[in-house]
Amino acid sequence: STHTLPHSASRAAMLVRINTLLQGYSGIRFEILEAITKLLNHNITPCLPLRGTITASGDLVPLSYIAGLLTGRPNSKAVGPNGETMAAAEAFTLAGINGGFFELQPKEGLALVNGTAVGSGLASMVLFETNVLAILSEVLSAIFAEVMQGKPEFTDHLTHKLKHHPGQIEAAAVMEHILDGSSYVKAAQKLHEIDPLQKPKQDRYALRTSPQWLGPLIEVIRTSTKMIEREINSVNDNPLIDVSRNKALHGGNFPGSPIGVSMDNTLVLAIASIGKLMFAQFSELVNDYYNNGLPSNLTGGRNPSLDYGFKGAEIAMASYCSELQFLANPVTNHVQSAEQHNQDVNSLGLISARKTAEAVEILNVMSTTWLVALCQAIDLRHIEENLKNTVKNTVSQVAKRVLTMGFNGELHPSRFCEKDLLKVVDREYVFTYIDDPCSATYPLMQKLRQVLVDHALMNGEKEQNSSTSIFQKIGAFEEELKILLPKEVESARLELENGNPAIPNRITDRRSYPLYKFVREELGTVLLTGEKVGSPGEEFDKVFTAICAGKLIDPCWSVLKEWNGAPLPLC
């Protein structure tokens, strides 16, 4: 039922409550704890309501449903190991609980219901996922820097050491480790040397300041994690029974304030801000004005007019981010006085945990879309490198064939054009022309022609002689290129599609490779081209299912397995 607490959260509450009661300050029989344990071990879960608690005198309402099952109330329901619904008697039989239902003794009812276990149980699950997503966001930011051909100095330890914040230092060190020795970074440095003005001197904020953005969020998540860790190991019912002094202490450990505060901080500050960064990075990656040569919308097909790539995904990301920002409002400032003003202040801890769980789900969807987009960008860089190599070889071949010799076999002045022609290929972004490489309206042919015209203008009096004129070679050069280049480009594409590229994918020797390998090989996702029946949503679904099942943890950790936890030494 949509009005029932998820069974995983109910089971977490049972475990946390057992942990609290085992500490011996709650006045409850050990046999009751054994019964709850048997229910857990036999995968029998009481049905708890989704709503109805303010986590003030603990989570009274949902915890009473566990007590109701233990005492055999006729309306008590549980869910069995195969999802079947059962009454209390069947649950006891299946769990092997002997002796019948419990008749509660003094204090035992309060011991069961007067505590924060439901809120803190759900909060602990939420924070586990949030910690994983925080590390994933660091890793994905580093991969983003690679595919964007970013400048790696943004991770230099001195910059972050001077800022003093530990979360920022950690985020930068993680990214620095992934980028250290990256062939993508080395290739980007060569491009910057070829044409220093081709891209901005400094990368945009979503890349360059990602450690500064993520750093405080990591610290917030760590603080919240520590608060919930303390809460799930605390004694939080009332009154407390101090056997050593023969006292019943009437206090107030039952409010879930640590839950509400930690969940609000995690939701409002951390999760929403991580999502905002992912959206900013995603928007930059799909925009060909910013992404340093990748195709608009990361289209991978031969015909960009028929392949909209990640355009729909970008719209979806805007939707996810908007919903996430809406959820990023604190819950604890909406407290209402309750129980005839006895519970006049309360925590709303479980409500905050539920809303944070919703936010985590949205961030999972955003992480899915972002990860698939990065894998697409990695493959497009591989395609770009192979196609540029093909174009360069073809231009060189045609230049040698057409421009080297004159009509009578003599060396021709146009032979000196080849070097400048190849510089054009090096500087021009492949995806600005590759769908129709010989089109006169695309930049490649225009700039190749301009090189020949410039050389012709410098040829002086030799231009007046048809046997030494460079200008008269332009037509032959272009015609030869139009015959050869489209065939060579298509041949290179087919080799890529058949897994036999001339240049292997650089990602295979990178530290980020385990994540790429998991998405591409283990989950079986493919490059999106618009040429196949499968839709982007099918690829996203594979990754989202894996993230929700916790399968992304191992490959994410594998990316960092060689990291010693410290920044690279300054040198």
UniProtKB/Swiss-Prot annotation:
* UniProt cross-link 5-imidazolinone (Ala-Gly), position: A56-G58
Q: Which GO terms describe its cellular component?
A: cytoplasm
List the disulfide bonds in this chain: none
The alphabetized UniProt keywords are:
Cytoplasm, Lyase, Phenylalanine catabolism, Phenylpropanoid metabolism
Q: What does the record give as its pathway?
A: Phenylpropanoid metabolism; trans-cinnamate biosynthesis; trans-cinnamate from L-phenylalanine: step 1/1
Root EC class: lyase
One GO biological process term: L-phenylalanine catabolic process
Query: EC annotation?
Result: 4.3.1.24
2,3-didehydroalanine (Ser), modified sites: S57
Q: Consult the record and explain the modifications the protein receives after translation.
A: Contains an active site 4-methylidene-imidazol-5-one (MIO), which is formed autocatalytically by cyclization and dehydration of residues Ala-Ser-Gly.
Q: Which SUPFAM superfamilies match?
A: L-aspartase-like
Name the positions where (E)-cinnamate binds: N114, Q202, R208, N238, K311, E339, N342
Report the locations given in the UniProt record.
Answer: Cytoplasm
- Return the InterPro entries for the record: Aromatic_Lyase, Fumarase/histidase_N, L-Aspartase-like, Phe/His_NH3-lyase_AS, Phe_NH3-lyase, Phe_NH3-lyase_shielding_dom_sf
Q: What chemistry does it catalyse, as a reaction equation?
A: L-phenylalanine = (E)-cinnamate + NH4(+)
Can you provide one Gene Ontology molecular function annotated for this UniProt record? phenylalanine ammonia-lyase activity
Q: Pfam families recorded for this chain?
A: Lyase_aromatic (PF00221)
Self-association state and partner proteins as the record states: Homotetramer.
Q: Which family does the record claim for this protein?
A: Belongs to the PAL/histidase family.
* Function description: This is a key enzyme of plant metabolism catalyzing the first reaction in the biosynthesis from L-phenylalanine of a wide variety of natural products based on the phenylpropane skeleton.
Q: What is this protein called?
A: Phenylalanine ammonia-lyase G4
Q: Which organism is it from?
A: Populus kitakamiensis
Gene that specifies this protein: PALG4
